[in-house]
């Protein structure tokens, strides 16, 4: 009788790494995977996103093997790049740090559609606008606050 060892998931980790530049380090060591093999595969799959922040979900198994899923770059990073700023406002209610066009925001919304919980680009655009508002950014021609149907 042949016994086959069943793989068990030991950990699921969510990390943000730089595309094409992952290196073995403490963040990966804690996941418990073959770091050299992971960095080789990750860098190969993200070479077209060189220098961008790439969220990754790593599923580690008891035999040190792994699976990983790449996500799209975080909205905050995309907004900062579009507005050409280093960071958001310390107090976004009173301080505005920049402005981007509706076209740039729509481009971000279309890029992020796969990872957002939105049915269409208009809903995704409102989510992007909400994030921008929390960072102290304005999107020309877009109001992040929409009227709710409740209590109207």
UniProtKB/Swiss-Prot annotation:
GO terms for molecular function: large ribosomal subunit rRNA binding; structural constituent of ribosome. One or more lysine residues are methylated. Keywords: Methylation, Ribonucleoprotein, Ribosomal protein, RNA-binding, rRNA-binding. The keyword Ribosomal protein applies. Belongs to the universal ribosomal protein uL11 family. Forms part of the ribosomal stalk which helps the ribosome interact with GTP-bound translation factors. Part of the ribosomal stalk of the 50S ribosomal subunit. Interacts with L10 and the large rRNA to form the base of the stalk. L10 forms an elongated spine to which L12 dimers bind in a sequential fashion forming a multimeric L10(L12)X complex. This is Large ribosomal subunit protein uL11. It comes from Mycoplasmoides gallisepticum (strain R(low / passage 15 / clone 2)).
């Amino acid at each position: 009788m042949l016994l086959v060892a069943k793989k068990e998931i030991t950990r699921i980790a969510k990390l943000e790494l730089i595309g094409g530049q992952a290196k073995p380090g403490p963040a990966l060591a804690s996941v418990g995977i073959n770091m050299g093999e992971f960095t080789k595969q990750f860098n190969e799959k993200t070479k077209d996103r060189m220098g961008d922040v790439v969220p990754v979900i790593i599923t580690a198994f008891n035999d040190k093997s792994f699976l990983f899923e790449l996500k799209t770059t975080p909205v905050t990073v995309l907004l900062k790049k579009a507005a050409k700023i280093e960071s958001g406002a310390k107090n976004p209610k009173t301080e505005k740090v920049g402005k981007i066009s509706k076209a740039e925001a729509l481009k971000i919304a279309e890029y992020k559609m796969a990872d957002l919980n939105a049915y269409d680009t208009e809903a995704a655009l409102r989510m992007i606008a909400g994030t921008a508002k929390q960072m102290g950014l304005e999107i020309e021609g877009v109001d992040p606050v929409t009227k709710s149907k409740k209590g109207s």
